[in-house]
Amino acid sequence: MGKHNHAHIEASGVPLAQAARDALEKAGEAWTDMRAQIFDAVAEIGKPASAYEIADIVSQKRGRRVAPNSVYRILDLFVANNLVRRVESANAFVANSHPGCLHDCIFLICDQCGAAVHVDNDRLSDEVRAAAEATGFAAERPVIEVRGKCAECQ
């Protein structure tokens, strides 16, 4: 895995915040100052962060308290529009470095430093969906989380 990725550039070379803004506006949603600040906070943290941690960061930048429930609503909008991914086991969020890609969530989560790397593996996702379908289960949002130690922490 190499070094932790703290890049704020989307794969196409567009700044990540601009790619997120473009995707949200394409979906018919406004890119407000609050949404921009929340997205920037998620992207800058570089590892899974709770809504409370994000609210604290945004509150400091705004100079006034931002309620975690407001942050949750915006994070839910971001998740629905593929701008942010939810790390289910930690009830935390990470910026999606590829807002235009629609892949299932596969995370490699470091138990030591907390970093989470999102991996795209359509073959594995297809296998999980097929296994679910074989049992009559309609998978809507497969999430796979693998816990261990990243290359930096080994």
Model feature map: region roles:
Residues W31-D33, E44-S50:
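Short capping segments at the starts of secondary-structure elements
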Residues V71-N81:
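Basic amphipathic alpha-helical segments that dock to polyanions
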